[in-house]
Amino acid sequence: MATTAYIMIEAGVGKVGDVASALRSVPGVTMVDVVIGPYDIIATVSAQDMNAVSEVLANRVHKIKGVTRTLTCISLQR
């Protein structure tokens, strides 16, 4: 069964659109919503396991220019 993670993302001033666009091209990212609240974007990642989710976060999401902070929540049951 795939592992699903919800990533709350804070983007730099004026970078929300660029970050959201970049996220949409990341393999494993299945949804990107721009939101209002303490975070600017919520993205959903679906991957084979926790290691694969970690790879997406470390090697793709955190390297997007304009990402300043993230909070990741792992789904336990759907």
Sequence positions of predicted segments:
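A compositional/biophysical signature of low hydrophobicity enriched in polar/charged and small residues
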Residues: 1-78
